[in-house]
Amino acid sequence: MDNEQLQKLTEDISLQDFGKPFRHRAFFNDRLKTTGGRYMLSSHNIELNRKYLIEHGRSELVGIIKHELCHYHLHLEGKGYKHRDKDFRDLLQKVGAPRFCTPLQTKKTQKKTYMYRCAACGQQYIKKRAMNPERYACGKCRGKIKRIF
């Protein structure tokens, strides 16, 4: 599915389920990592995560589009468009849109850890960020620090 097909699908869902036209742009944003989609308040455009279409299929994407269209139509009408607002929750229930999307199953890359050891006393240091061991000394004995991995 490309952006033109997504635009057409969004316009069709808006007319069928909401009875109102969608007059802005809907497109895939490949930079989205964890969210299914987002409604942009300033431009009124809807950005969607292509990974949800690939992993969960068209039905999940339709649910995300409905969710974002709830934000869209309520915001344009001047009603409560935030997740906690009653207007938003009522409209979600009316159109059958999910409140949250199914989490992605793709594996998250494990953060790299760095291990350092004092050459004198053997004190170990595990860090999430790399450091230059020549600039630091052991906090226990002031000995030299060596990088293990």
Swiss-Prot record:
Cofactor(s) essential for the protein: Zn(2+)
Keyword terms: Cytoplasm, Metal-binding, Zinc
Main location: cytoplasm
Cofactor details (free text): Binds 1 zinc ion.
Alphabetical list of Pfam families matching this protein: SprT-like, Zn_ribbon_SprT
Subcellular location: Cytoplasm
Stored SMART domains: SprT (SM00731)
Gene Ontology CC terms: cytoplasm
Binding site for Zn(2+): 67, 71
Gene Ontology molecular function, alphabetical: zinc ion binding
Database matches in InterPro entries: SprT-like_domain (IPR006640), SprT_Zn_ribbon (IPR035240), Uncharacterised_SprT-like (IPR023524)
A biological process term (GO) from this entry: response to stress
Domain of life according to the entry: Bacteria
Active site residues of this protein: 68
Domain SprT-like: 6-147
Family classification: Belongs to the SprT family.
Descriptive protein name: Protein SprT-like
Organism: Bacillus velezensis (strain DSM 23117 / BGSC 10A6 / LMG 26770 / FZB42)
Organism lineage string: Bacteria, Bacillati, Bacillota, Bacilli, Bacillales
